[in-house]
């Protein structure tokens, strides 16, 4: 950017908005060398259709990235532009470069496979539809080359023969040299075989040169050692050199053959490389957007009456500084611009964030054009801007030896020249053709009209902004001129905004306020910076009462704005609390309804059981009367029994309402574990609950749990015991006490070391065998807990299992699950 006179105003705007810095940040998220280069030199497209396609590609790659099983990476894809260019010039490709080509083919083939396996990636399927990954070329390269890039013997029979010959000659040379070392060891400085160039030599003492005839190829720095090729191996050395030349010739022939194959598919390789770069860029856009916490923009088309909505918008470069370089936290701004607004005048003190607001808006408009997401809260709604044109800063003025005012005017002239000629309403659907919509431009003006006499500068700024209001653009301008604040009340296409100033701390808050013009606060800032108070007071006197009254009115509006914002925040908080309360009440009502249904079901079961018992008793009486000879005594007994049954049924009353009962989704406490857990299933009949405790799922008796506020589960009331029945038969034998559960080999399954499938198969068999015992101990061990979870998941759905729980600590604890059978 050293010679800005050669740049268009759109290109110069990229520099003013620090677009190259953002591109550099984006490049750090790429995975290929060409992707990084493309990201660093990324330019926004000039057509809306291209931006729409880029955004769709970003969203498609995001869906791939969000899939946990996707094999989406760019390993193996290299920058092969140099070897491709050399091949086009008739040059030779090296072995390592050929391997890079093969790796690139394999990498792109893998990416294409991921895309083709999905039905929802039409935009990417279209992108890779014409890509040829050339498996034949890849196979030929791997057949001819080893992993180190050297030509392999399998590449040709001739090469294999040459290398066998080389091996034989080397062995002959080694054998002869070993014999010389053994015979003339006194002449050697060291008993080693070394090389000088491509010749084998021995280190000979200088004084023994005459005893070792041969060719001297080198000497030590001191001259005490001569490196001599003994005469006995000179001829073999010549044969070795000749064989090496033959090997080199054959290797070059094979590389030439592979290079010619590359040349034949050069256009396919260049296209493949371009597509890989575009996919890498799309992936980088996704990852950079994710890092920013950004959301995709929804385009507002010309004629759309929706407002531009950018809530909690953050400057991406300041966010980078805060996160990566330890800079201050970014203060987000909110932009909501109605569709009829054409010009926004931002006023307020210096260093208050006016220029940052301009740059933020300009940068995110560029980001949207290249397919990046916007660092703002959802939903992001904004138009596609045909051009982003800015006049920010005085760099151009300094470079061209212009005054500040002249520099601004020259740049504004270029902005006006870049806008479409003629006065058109881009937001009027009657003017725009549906097939050829006129997209607006975005014009950003910093300190419009500054650098000259305030009266003339203000008049010029008003005229300029009124002219821009008639153009197909949205203009955002910062200013200190109070006259510009009044334009809103004269023309509905104008809007005011201001950067907030804290009168208490005498410092800006960097928040953007809409609808209220700002105060320059020059005197307050001067006082905060240390200017003597007497000077500040004298300036206030010179300023006059009318100006002070205006500032007081604006200050009052700002105070009312803050008060309304506080009330809105309180109302929002109250709304959130109400929603939470509503959810809690709804959950409680659902819980009560569930308990009512459960209670009714329980009562129905009790009634059915009582009816069945009564029928059985009556049947017994009838059978007794039918078996023996009727007598008055038996008839009397039967009458008494029937009366007793009738009295029992009349005495039946509805059970008491059940007290605390756990519900699905509720968190409860298990005192024996000292942990809380979440209820996933309630079995009222078995008086157990299924709970999730960390990674464990288990069944726990209700008697062993309590609510978070300490309430114990109240068991359902038992039916009144039926009085002892008067029977005609001999009295029944005394009821047996429940059997004691005893662990034996027959009711114990050890599945440690089993895979889950085998464990389930063995568990099914063991459950059937343990039916008589009524209980089954399953030893699964502790380990990672995966086998335990699988076993307990299997038990929770098995019809033979009534409940299950972890064994006591003295019986295996978390390594053993006890299943109680029906």
Swiss-Prot record:
Domain (Smr): residue spans on this chain: 749-822
SMART domains: MUTSac (SM00534), MUTSd (SM00533), SMR (SM00463)
Top-level taxon of origin: Bacteria
Assembly and interaction partners: Homodimer. Binds to stalled ribosomes, contacting rRNA.
Alphabetic keyword roster: ATP-binding, DNA-binding, Endonuclease, Hydrolase, Nuclease, Nucleotide-binding, RNA-binding, rRNA-binding
Biological role stated in the UniProt entry: Endonuclease that is involved in the suppression of homologous recombination and thus may have a key role in the control of bacterial genetic diversity. Acts as a ribosome collision sensor, splitting the ribosome into its 2 subunits. Detects stalled/collided 70S ribosomes which it binds and splits by an ATP-hydrolysis driven conformational change. Acts upstream of the ribosome quality control system (RQC), a ribosome-associated complex that mediates the extraction of incompletely synthesized nascent chains from stalled ribosomes and their subsequent degradation. Probably generates substrates for RQC.
Region annotation Disordered: where it falls in the sequence: 707-737
The organism of origin for this protein: Synechocystis sp. (strain ATCC 27184 / PCC 6803 / Kazusa)
GO molecular function, one term: ATP binding
Keyword Hydrolase applies: yes
Keyword Ligase set for record: no
Protein name: Endonuclease MutS2
Compositionally skewed regions (Basic and acidic residues) per UniProt: 709-728
Family: Belongs to the DNA mismatch repair MutS family. MutS2 subfamily.
A Pfam family per the record: Smr
Record EC number: 3.1.-.-, 3.6.4.-
Annotated positions binding ATP: 348-355
């Amino acid at each position: 950017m050293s010679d800005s006179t050669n740049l268009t105003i759109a290109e110069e705007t990229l520099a003013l908005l620090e677009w190259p810095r953002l591109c550099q940040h984006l490049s750090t998220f790429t995975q290929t060398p060409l992707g990084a280069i493309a990201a660093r030199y990324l330019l926004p497209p000039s057509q809306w259709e291209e931006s729409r396609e880029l955004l769709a590609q970003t969203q498609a790659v995001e869906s791939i990235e969000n899939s946990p099983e996707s094999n989406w990476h760019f390993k193996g894809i290299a920058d092969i532009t140099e070897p491709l260019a050399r091949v086009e010039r008739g040059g030779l490709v090296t072995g390592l470069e050929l391997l890079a080509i093969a790796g690139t083919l394999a990498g792109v083939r893998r990416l294409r496979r991921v895309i083709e396996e999905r039905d929802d990636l039409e935009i990417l399927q279209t992108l890779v539809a014409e890509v040829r990954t050339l498996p034949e070329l890849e196979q030929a390269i791997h057949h001819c080359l080893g992993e180190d890039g050297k030509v392999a013997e399998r590449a040709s029979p001739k090469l294999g023969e040459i290398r066998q010959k080389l091996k034989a000659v080397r062995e002959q040379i080694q054998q002869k040299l070993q014999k010389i070392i053994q015979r003339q060891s006194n002449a050697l400085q060291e008993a080693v075989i070394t090389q000088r160039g491509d010749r084998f030599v021995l280190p000979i003492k200088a004084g023994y040169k005459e005893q070792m005839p041969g060719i001297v190829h080198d000497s030590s720095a001191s001259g005490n050692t001569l490196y001599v090729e003994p005469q006995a191996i000179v001829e073999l050395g010549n044969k070795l050199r000749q064989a090496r030349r033959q090997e080199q010739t054959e290797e070059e022939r094979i590389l030439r053959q592979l290079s010619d194959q590359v040349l034949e598919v050069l256009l396919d390789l260049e296209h493949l490389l371009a597509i890989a770069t575009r996919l890498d860029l799309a992936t980088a856009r996704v990852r950079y957007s994710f890092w920013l916490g950004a959301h995709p923009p929804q385009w507002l088309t010309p004629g759309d009456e929706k407002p531009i909505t950018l809530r909690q918008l953050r400057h991406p470069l300041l966010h980078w500084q805060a996160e990566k370089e330890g800079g201050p936290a970014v203060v987000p701004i909110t932009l909501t611009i109605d569709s009829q607004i054409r010009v926004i005048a931002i006023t307020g003190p210096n260093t208050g964030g006016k220029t940052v607001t301009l740059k933020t808006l300009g940068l995110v408009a560029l980001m949207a054009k290249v397919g990046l997401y916007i660092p703002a809260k959802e939903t992001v709604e904004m138009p596609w801007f045909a051009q982003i044109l800015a006049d920010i800063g005085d760099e151009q003025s300094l470079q061209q030896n212009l005054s500040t005012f002249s520099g601004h005017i020259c740049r504004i002239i270029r902005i006006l020249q870049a806008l479409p000629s003629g006065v058109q309403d881009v937001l009027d659907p009657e003017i725009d053709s549906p097939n050829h919509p006129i997209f607006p431009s975005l014009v950003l003006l910093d300190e419009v009209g500054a650098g000259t006499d305030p009266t003339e500068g203000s008049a010029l700024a008003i005229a300029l902004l009124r002219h821009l209001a008639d153009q197909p653009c949205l203009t955002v301008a910062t200013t200190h001129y109070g006259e510009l604040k009044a334009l809103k009340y004269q023309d509905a296409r104008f809007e005011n905004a201001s950067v907030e100033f804290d009168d208490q701390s005498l410092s800006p808050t960097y928040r953007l306020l809409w609808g209220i013009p700002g105060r320059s606060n020059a005197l307050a800032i001067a006082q905060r910076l240390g200017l003597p108070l007497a000077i500040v007071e004298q300036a206030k006197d010179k300023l006059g009462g009318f100006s002070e009254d205006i500032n007081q009115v604006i200050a009052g509006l700002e105070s009312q704005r803050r008060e309304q914002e506080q009330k809105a925040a309180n109302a929002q908080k109250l709304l959130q609390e109400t929603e939470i309360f509503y959810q809690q009440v709804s959950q409680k009502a659902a819980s009560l309804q569930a308990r009512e249904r459960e209670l009714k079901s329980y009562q129905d079961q009790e009634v059915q059981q009582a009816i069945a018992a009564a029928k059985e008793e009556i049947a017994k009486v009838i059978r007794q009367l039918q078996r023996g000879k009727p007598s008055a005594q038996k008839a009397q007994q039967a009458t008494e029994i029937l009366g007793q049954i009738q009295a029992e049924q009349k005495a039946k009353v509805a059970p008491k309402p059940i007290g605390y009962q756990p519900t699905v989704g509720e968190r409860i406490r298990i005192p024996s574990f000292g942990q809380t857990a979440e209820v996933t299933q309630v079995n009222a009949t078995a008086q157990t609950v299924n709970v999730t405790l960390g990674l464990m799922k288990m069944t726990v008796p209700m008697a062993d749990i309590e609510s978070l506020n300490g309430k114990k589960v109240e068991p359902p009331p038992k039916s009144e015991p039926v009085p002892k029945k008067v029977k005609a038969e001999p009295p029944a034998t005394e009821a047996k006490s429940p059997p004691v559960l005893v662990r034996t080999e027959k009711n114990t399954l050890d599945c440690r070391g089993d895979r889950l499938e085998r464990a389930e198969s063995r568990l099914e068999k063991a459950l059937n065998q343990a039916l008589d015992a009524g209980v089954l101990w399953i030893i699964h061990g502790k380990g990672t807990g995966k086998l335990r979870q699988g076993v307990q998941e299997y038990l929770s759905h098995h019809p033979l299992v009534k409940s299950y729980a972890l064994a006591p600590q003295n019986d295996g604890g978390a390594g053993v699950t006890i299943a109680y059978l029906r």
